[in-house]
Amino acid sequence: MDDQLKQSALDFHEFPVPGKIQVSPTKPLATQRDLALAYSPGVAAPCLEIEKDPLKAYKYTARGNLVAVISNGTAVLGLGNIGALAGKPVMEGKGVLFKKFAGIDVFDIEVDELDPDKFIEVVAALEPTFGGINLEDIKAPECFYIEQKLRERMNIPVFHDDQHGTAIISTAAILNGLRVVEKNISDVRMVVSGAGAAAIACMNLLVALGLQKHNIVVCDSKGVIYQGREPNMAETKAAYAVVDDGKRTLDDVIEGADIFLGCSGPKVLTQEMVKKMARAPMILALANPEPEILPPLAKEVRPDAIICTGRSDYPNQVNNVLCFPFIFRGALDVGATAINEEMKLAAVRAIAELAHAEQSEVVASAYGDQDLSFGPEYIIPKPFDPRLIVKIAPAVAKAAMESGVATRPIADFDVYIDKLTEFVYKTNLFMKPIFSQARKAPKRVVLPEGEEARVLHATQELVTLGLAKPILIGRPNVIEMRIQKLGLQIKAGVDFEIVNNESDPRFKEYWTEYFQIMKRRGVTQEQAQRALISNPTVIGAIMVQRGEADAMICGTVGDYHEHFSVVKNVFGYRDGVHTAGAMNALLLPSGNTFIADTYVNDEPDAEELAEITLMAAETVRRFGIEPRVALLSHSNFGSSDCPSSSKMRQALELVRERAPELMIDGEMHGDAALVEAIRNDRMPDSSLKGSANILVMPNMEAARISYNLLRVSSSEGVTVGPVLMGVAKPVHVLTPIASVRRIVNMVALAVVEAQTQPL
């Protein structure tokens, strides 16, 4: 580690507060009553319920989502036996990964005890606190004994990740690698370097999946492990001892091997050894930080080799974070009493299958131009693939139920998977009613920026989720090339339609219709033709206008107002509406907040504000939310008389005339809108109850500033929109920062609007 990296790491761990984890309350502690419920006397009620039924601890405490990361520091991350205290940063780091990838809370526990039996006593006594135990960085062979004894004694999952995590990922990689090179697991021969926890666990899993034990040769620091080599050989090693044929070294046994599994140390495998391996060999060089052989050296002599390492700077990284958070997620969610072989094998299969799926946009963004299509350079998923939790946790949970170790079986896996999806996509719960409605009758949605990677990823999701019938505008050869490069599985003409923006035979009809719309706005026939060629949003808008598409989503490239100008000119406003407006949703930990008008009207008058407010309330109801509207101003219920506050008061009167049932009040300050106590202090008889969820601003400047401040200041908040309101057709204009999920969300909303506004 160079000095700069070392200092950066030390600063990272020291500032702004020491360490990487903290405990945060999940219940409010704002009043005396809150304290009485959280502690004495109210806390006695759940205590007595748990005394009567211990399983209620999962209902009334955090136990069901709490894992202990426990170590004695005897084998810390390549640092060796540095002791329990020195290993604490690693254990905190493990806790951060649990939380980041699976939402699991962790207490890291460093036990200063080298005696395995005493260590077992300490850990076993902690069972009432935790839903699961993750053993970490405990040296072999003690780790085998400790895990075995704890599993026998405890009725919660005990999982030594150094063994099983590496084994699960390695096994998934081997299954996929064999598929790539078309070899059968029952026929291949494997040579293993290292006989520690990970190597033994990996061999056990592979044997369970069909690898023949007599086709495995293991080498440790003393050479080949053969029967009779030493009288007191550890039982775990002895299980893989081969009949003595006189071969003593790795070089002696590597010839003809299909698989090399390295769990040992750097530079153990040489180029000469690699040359002697079988056709299309698999090399898993997992020693860290320097593997048994560097991939470029192996590829130099065997271009046909498939290579995995534990490093992120080479393809096919075997990284335990691919499995341990999600195995525990599935185990905790069914109240598993153990993580058994069936659950591990379920994880292996789920991980292996995910590598065959289309590429995730999140992964594509993280890994740049890497080709992440299934093949020699991509046989296991990347650690940041957001689908890992959705695939692995349900597979593990099902295996726990089928193998009889689940105490709280899941009744509806569709609901469970939806809940897991909420962890991946924070908008999932919010969008659920929209998605459900869209699936009932998917509509044709045209996407003018059809060559964009985000749009292509969104198209894949739309097809997979059954939300829409996408129509992409773009050059077919470019779209096909990018689909292949992105590793997507959608097919033009099957999953979506392409409109060639260079040569569609309908273009004369399109520009003629556009000219008819624009001819009295200074647009000539020649300009109409040029607009169609240069601006795919014009093509999309005309398609919707002609009934060849039901809705349109544009704006992922270019200026919002240029796109909106096309939309406004082609479609105009809905009947009875004299303006349009844009609204953004912020999904914050404190609740959902909608802000209008964020993009369309610079200085709306009272009439326009009233229309925007009514459209905002209508839109919010689509999400299954009852609107509560606050009209905001620097004035608080008449405290200041100026044009801005006056128009907000006028808008309130207009809204109340047109929608007397709507819960609305104003004009008011922002704090009064969000905190009922502040509002009631100023206006005790306010018709607005609770916290407002729609904030209507006096102008676009205030709306955009408020929206961006809230968006950036809330690290846990996510956004939906902008939602375009008031246009005669189901159309939304996004912005260039729109993510794939935002595109998907807005397409689904447009579909629902098209269902209720038939063309």
Swiss-Prot record:
GO terms for molecular function: acyltransferase activity; identical protein binding; malate dehydrogenase (decarboxylating) (NADP+) activity; malolactic enzyme activity; manganese ion binding; NAD binding; oxaloacetate decarboxylase activity. It is an enzyme of class 1 (oxidoreductase). CDD domains: NAD_bind_2_malic_enz. Keywords: Acetylation, Magnesium, Manganese, Metal-binding, Multifunctional enzyme, NADP, Oxidoreductase. GO terms for biological process: malate metabolic process. Its cofactor is Mg(2+); Mn(2+). Inhibited by 4 mM Mg(2+) and acetyl-CoA, competitively inhibited by fumarate and oxaloacetate. Activated by glutamate and aspartate, glucose-6-phosphate, acetyl-phosphate and 2 mM KCl. SMART domains: malic (SM01274), Malic_M (SM00919). NADP(+) binds at residues 195-198, 288, 320. Optimum pH is 7.5 for L-malate. Its EC number is 1.1.1.40. A divalent metal cation binds at residues 136-137, 162. The keyword Oxidoreductase applies. The active site is at 39 (proton donor), 94 (proton acceptor). The modification N6-acetyllysine is found at residue 56. The-C-terminal phosphate acetyltransferase domain is responsible for oligomerization, and is responsible for inhibition by acetyl-CoA and activation by glutamate, aspartate, and glucose-6-phosphate as shown by its deletion. The isolated domain does not catalyze the interconversion of acetyl-CoA and acetyl-phosphate. This is NADP-dependent malic enzyme. It comes from Escherichia coli (strain K12).
